[in-house]
């Protein structure tokens, strides 16, 4: 599990957008499971889950409706979608808020809805931008535990400007500043 560290404005979120194919780099590329993200972004994105900094969600939908929508656009049949949504809900502990409109949820629960959409299709690769941003201490502990559990079977990259976050859950770290790698290691 790689922790992508750097101060605010270092280029972490921009780099994450390029790795996931949502922003085309001016030069270079990234290979996702051997697939060039610049040449075949949709194919590469099939094997990854992405939690952007401001996780997309329709505010008038409930978490249940949103996850149903995400499983449909991911092409899961009804039985697989139900099972996938149940697994994502369990992992993100959303049971108590499933039928509340997303715009009424706390920032922490909205963040968990974003995480649930990133993992609902059980991707091989998980890329998360500030995954514990806005979470209270208990929620941070729960989400960190879930991330550690997922890291047993997935390649994971998280970005943060908080060293404690990387220290708590990552096995490797990369520090960038102004879009350039400063140091990398364990």
Model-derived regions, located:
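ABC transporter nucleotide-binding domains
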Residues: 1-177, 182-183
